[in-house]
Amino acid sequence: MAQQAADKYLYVDKNFINNPLAQADWAAKKLVWVPSSKNGFEPASLKEEVGEEAIVELVENGKKVKVNKDDIQKMNPPKFSKVEDMAELTCLNEASVLHNLKERYYSGLIYTYSGLFCVVINPYKNLPIYSEEIVEMYKGKKRHEMPPHIYAITDTAYRSMMQDREDQSILCTGESGAGKTENTKKVIQYLAHVASSHKSKKDQGELERQLLQANPILEAFGNAKTVKNDNSSRFGKFIRINFDVNGYIVGANIETYLLEKSRAIRQAKEERTFHIFYYLLSGAGEHLKTDLLLEPYNKYRFLSNGHVTIPGQQDKDMFQETMEAMRIMGIPEDEQMGLLRVISGVLQLGNIAFKKERNTDQASMPDNTAAQKVSHLLGINVTDFTRGILTPRIKVGRDYVQKAQTKEQADFAIEALAKATYERMFRWLVLRINKALDKTKRQGASFIGILDIAGFEIFDLNSFEQLCINYTNEKLQQLFNHTMFILEQEEYQREGIEWNFIDFGLDLQPCIDLIEKPAGPPGILALLDEECWFPKATDKSFVEKVVQEQGTHPKFQKPKQLKDKADFCIIHYAGKVDYKADEWLMKNMDPLNDNIATLLHQSSDKFVSELWKDVDRIIGLDQVAGMSETALPGAFKTRKGMFRTVGQLYKEQLAKLMATLRNTNPNFVRCIIPNHEKKAGKLDPHLVLDQLRCNGVLEGIRICRQGFPNRVVFQEFRQRYEILTPNSIPKGFMDGKQACVLMIKALELDSNLYRIGQSKVFFRAGVLAHLEEERDLKITDVIIGFQACCRGYLARKAFAKRQQQLTAMKVLQRNCAAYLRLRNWQWWRLFTKVKPLLNSIRHEDELLAKEAELTKVREKHLAAENRLTEMETMQSQLMAEKLQLQEQLQAETELCAEAEELRARLTAKKQELEEICHDLEARVEEEEERCQYLQAEKKKMQQNIQELEEQLEEEESARQKLQLEKVTTEAKLKKLEEDQIIMEDQNCKLAKEKKLLEDRVAEFTTNLMEEEEKSKSLAKLKNKHEAMITDLEERLRREEKQRQELEKTRRKLEGDSTDLSDQIAELQAQIAELKMQLAKKEEELQAALARVEEEAAQKNMALKKIRELETQISELQEDLESERASRNKAEKQKRDLGEELEALKTELEDTLDSTAAQQELRSKREQEVSILKKTLEDEAKTHEAQIQEMRQKHSQAVEELADQLEQTKRVKATLEKAKQTLENERGELANEVKALLQGKGDSEHKRKKVEAQLQELQVKFSEGERVRTELADKVTKLQVELDSVTGLLSQSDSKSSKLTKDFSALESQLQDTQELLQEENRQKLSLSTKLKQMEDEKNSFREQLEEEEEAKRNLEKQIATLHAQVTDMKKKMEDGVGCLETAEEAKRRLQKDLEGLSQRLEEKVAAYDKLEKTKTRLQQELDDLLVDLDHQRQSVSNLEKKQKKFDQLLAEEKTISAKYAEERDRAEAEAREKETKALSLARALEEAMEQKAELERLNKQFRTEMEDLMSSKDDVGKSVHELEKSKRALEQQVEEMKTQLEELEDELQATEDAKLRLEVNLQAMKAQFERDLQGRDEQSEEKKKQLVRQVREMEAELEDERKQRSMAMAARKKLEMDLKDLEAHIDTANKNREEAIKQLRKLQAQMKDCMRELDDTRASREEILAQAKENEKKLKSMEAEMIQLQEELAAAERAKRQAQQERDELADEIANSSGKGALALEEKRRLEARIAQLEEELEEEQGNTELINDRLKKANLQIDQINTDLNLERSHAQKNENARQQLERQNKELKAKLQEMESAVKSKYKASIAALEAKIAQLEEQLDNETKERQAASKQVRRTEKKLKDVLLQVEDERRNAEQFKDQADKASTRLKQLKRQLEEAEEEAQRANASRRKLQRELEDATETADAMNREVSSLKNKLRRGDLPFVVTRRIVRKGTGDCSDEEVDGKADGADAKAAE
């Protein structure tokens, strides 16, 4: 029953498919698909076709509807209903795909193949298709053998991994709620079952169980209920399952992406937070609730919606399942309780309430009950916790202060803490699961990755999390498109097969670039990261920057809703998504309270402190948090000190994921959501259609059908399928390609089914599966034959064995019979009794000999035992010696291995250093290029400053002229004031109407600009259709003219001749009617002509209309153009009327020649025509006179505007001179700035390079010293202990000498780099002082320049406004009332034109869409027909093959019948022979009977002589018996022969009947086949002809489109060139000035940042160098202690004191040189106290060493007590070795700390202080380790008591080494002195730089005074201007208001725009 239920949801009902009624109905009704608003598409019957439309009858209700042909889609035959692979559909279109999916979904079949991938629709219910039996059904099966299922996809990936040894990935994609997570679980379930190393089904391995239980844990902690999905994954995961070579699972790893941690604190309506919160509150027992302080749901603020339940799920049961899963995963109970405590603590954090105090904004906590619960659960102090929230300690300067928080800040801190705590717990859980899943020791050979990431989300308002999720889905969809469409076709082209590249238009790269592009222009994430750098940045500024940078992007839109709605929109592949950028900056930076984080790090709860162990790396500064590095192996390792945001980390993780997926073979599963109501059995067609379009399902099927999805390498194809063509390939060598060609010929494959490339054979879909089936059949036949041979061989072998047994039995029988005859013979009895007696005597002799031999053997045995005991003793001794030698040899090999490892490390470090050197060289080259670029910029700035100075001079002269002109203009203004008051009302009306017109025109022009691109693409089609339309219109006009002329004549004849007959009256009536129609047609004709002309000139006139509306000149030009157009229309009308009159004449002559009345009417008509001609000529003359008047007016206006233009040019020249003077000054400043930048860049580059080299070489030096000392010790040990193993000793000596050479080389390199470092430090200090001076000068000059630029801009604005007002007043006075009338006429005309244009544009757009639809429909039909043609060809080839096979079978039947006839003849002959034999045998039998009677008589006669004749009697009896037997056998043979003869006769008759039937059937089949073949040939020929016609038509259309496109492109390029030339003159000056200002500001900001960084890094570097030198002194002193005890201790104390003095001196110098270094003074003092404490402990240890030295001296004096002396020496040596190693580790750690402190200066020493504290803890641990190692050393010394002499030799060697170390210490002290001298020189240079800076400051003050004077003059001018008239004041205020809201660059642009307008 269970299997039948599962089959219902897997297999299709064949009866439904093979229904003949449905087939007949489909063929009879001509069923098609038509669009439906309700069902997407619905079936209809095609009734009639009328032009472009068709009449269809809907199947559902029988209603007849008119539908456009382009909207109709073909329907597949019923046999394709519910097809499993949609690539098999004959008609591939959206309707067929949707119908197939819908039918399968309603039948419970949720899985459907779509070409190469699988489509699954969420059923919203449980289906019985995931059991163990179903898994077994799909195990090892091919894809076409089983129905579609997720198991089939998984099995295909698994088999491909095993067969091709290629990593696989299964990508489950789709929207949220489509079923991705459930399908991911089914994939893991199948792999755990199939690839388990445990064969039994019941006994499942621990690893497989843990793998299956990982998902429930992650779902509990990372999934939640949303509006669309009850179990929505709120994080992404990539599950990597590793397999060994045999295909067994050896481990797994889970990578997670972007947990939506904000859900832990708030949820949307009807949504839940993460499941684990509800599981815990519902499933915890009373004891657990009291321990975790749990409360009801409504008591928690973070549970926004209270207790929201999920239908069909019990939270209590799920809690038990989750705890059981954690137990299976191996998570101990204490860690489980830690997780639950953290969950309860997160809930309690939401209950902490804050209150605002009355008089201040400070927050307070009136009730700390929740805080006490949180502190109890998390193991922290409640007072410290509340203090850290309400009054956290922050660092201000060098001190720490407590800052009071507001209520909002406290709430934000609590929420941030809750989110961070939950996120860290989730990361820890993932790390713990990975640790459990990756504990096996087996090596993984390949892997299968399963991707389950959050689906595409479109809410009403979407936030930062949705952007990241949708960005991920965009990348995955792009991967799908690239894999399915681009890479597939590129491989076709790469392999050189015939293929036309198809562009499916599914490139998502623009949208991805909009989000992730780093620069040019930067994407949204880059802009977000950039805004995070600025302290005053807000979400609003971020949105403004996004709109500014990406406002013109095609995938970016501004929202059209209210202000509180979305901030911007992005057009994703799944639709348009509105984003609200609230708190995006905070989410991207993810800040946290440092005080609380430190408190949690120090928690008494081990689990909580483990979660917060990386407290020093909480904020986005530094690299990723330490825990995230381990928990998220996908994180990229970046340089320390970089600002790491959430967006950057997620982008890097996603980049690594995409790289992993690209390196695998992807298998796509497209999950589709059927409805948003989560109802089972309901499918929303439009929703599914949108998902199918977005996912590229149709395109994937089409490329699968048209392309060659299966491909095999030549060698593999030959190896796999050569069994199908055994004799096709000749023996000997043959190229793989030639062999494949021969094999394909032998296989008789159709040429359309395959393509042969350069390295592979490509097959269409299904061909390879067919070959696999044939191969399986062939292998089956071969195996059956092989089995038959084996069985025959075994049967023959068994028969031979039975024959041997038979002969043996006969021998035994014969022997037994002989024995029975002999046993009673007396002589035999005597022989048996005597024979044993003969052997007894010989046996006694043998016993005596054996006894003698036994005695000898015993003696030998005793001797051998003695020798054996001796040998055993010797063996035991030798074994002991052997063990000793083996131990020695093992020790030697280990030493050699260590030496080899050291050598490998040194080589690796050498390579790293070389790589670093190459990187530094590359950086040097980059810096040189940057310097060159800066020099070029410097020259440009100098030129700009010179130009500005000249402009200032010109402006000064212009200002004086303006003062003179001001008096005259005031007088003019007074005169104009009266006129202005009169015209003001009219002007206001005109201005308002003009504004409205301009706004409408601007809107229409923007629309036209947007549609222009479409019109260009449409131009190709439009020109073609216009030509067709013009032809048709001309024909229509001719016919209409003819009809109109006839009707006119009739009407006129009616009016003129009332006395005519009735026929004439009817004609007159018709003429009257035709007159009316003629008037209408004339209007339509005029409109059509105007439309054609305006559309032809639309592209050329679109840009001109904006300028025409701006000024009255453009209005006059527009009037002129309209008059010309009307004149042309009138002329055309005149010509048309002339043509009509001529036509009327001819017709009248033809029709009315018979009557005289008709002649009179014709004469009257001619008179009327002459009158009409005269009126037309008069109208033309008046029209020309009007045009002449308008031309005169236009010329006068042009002359006046030219005069004004000359005046404005002169003013502009004066302003440009002043601008040049200012630009010259700015150029000088820019030169100085660039020089400073260049110096700074060089110094920074050199400093970083030398510091990196110094650090690397110091590490290398310390490693070399350690290696050298270790090798020296090991060499001495080897010399003493392994005298016999001389070969190994020589090898170790050679290695040690090689390492010493390397060490000496490294020492020389270190000295060189140190000298370079000294020089670089000197240069850096000098440059830094100069840089400070120049920066001060730059700032002063920059301020001066900004003030002067502001003054210049104000003057330019005033001048522009004055000129604009003057020109406006002049125009108003001149134009007057005429302007109003012309404006109104122009307004009406423009409105008409715009309405006509918009209507025509809509018509063209609709026509274009219609043509596009027809094109796509025809293309799809063509593709379907091509596919159908391929299928027909394939079927024809299959039929031909079947015909050949049938002929072969017929020939075989004929041969078989001939064989049967021969066998029949042969059997008859044999029967006749056997009859004769039977007769002869019968005669022989009669004779034998007679002989028997005679023998019986003789028997009676001679019975008395029985004994004598016994033998003869027996012989005769035997012969009789044998004769009887032979008789019976012959009779039996005769009977058998008769039966065989009868059977043969029957068979012969049957074969003859069968032969007749076969011949009849053969004739019938041949006739039928010929008819079918002929019909199909005819059909194929017809289809071929149709296709050829369609292809020719398409080619012709394509050629026309190409020509039109080339013409349009040429016109477009010409227009663009003209536009660029016009815009270039306007924009060059503005762009240069704006770019210079922007570059100057950027350089200033960079200069400030660099100076701050330089000061901070210099202070930190000097402090760290002092500490490094101190530690280096300690290291060298401790190394000296190891070799010479007393001298080392004294040297160490001196070095320590000296280092402390130097440290104090350097600390004082740092405090004096940099003010910012005092920020960390308090922390430094605390750390120094800690260091002093450690130094005291070190002195205690040194005191211990002094005691050991005393013992050593006593041992030297008392040489007799050599053993104790040896103990002391060895303990001392081992202690020094440990101390040296410890100091080396300290040195390495301090150097690492140096790098970390340099990188962490920006975060105010927080990270460095934490690192130092961690370092102190490590030093304490090292002290403990030292004591343990000392004890181990004492144990080791006891073993080496016999080796005192060798130790003494080692002591002498160590003394020599100590002397060398002393020399090195002296060198280091000299280097320290040199560094001090460099520091003093740097301070002197700093003083000199300060002096020069003060000098520049004085010069700057002088410059500011001059600027103030100029400002005063400007202000005086402003006061004078304010005393002017009202209109001027109004306009000036408007300008100020506009500039106040804009940036500086926008102000400059507007000022320049005003200049341009004034110039016009």
UniProtKB/Swiss-Prot annotation:
Residue ranges of domain Myosin motor in the record: 81-776
Q: Which residues carry this modification: Omega-N-methylarginine?
A: 1923
Residues with the Phosphoserine modification: 628, 1114, 1714, 1943
Q: Which Gene3D superfamilies match?
A: 1.10.10.820, 1.20.5.340, 1.20.58.530, 3.30.70.1590, 6.10.250.2420, Kinesin motor domain, Myosin S1 fragment, N-terminal, Myosin VI head, motor domain, U50 subdomain
User: Which Pfam families is this protein grouped with?
Assistant: Myosin_head, Myosin_N, Myosin_tail_1
A molecular-function term among this protein's GO annotations: calmodulin binding
Q: PANTHER family recorded for this chain?
A: MYOSIN HEAVY CHAIN, NON-MUSCLE (PTHR45615), MYOSIN-9 (PTHR45615:SF16)
UniProt name for this protein: Myosin-9
- The organism encoding this protein is Mus musculus
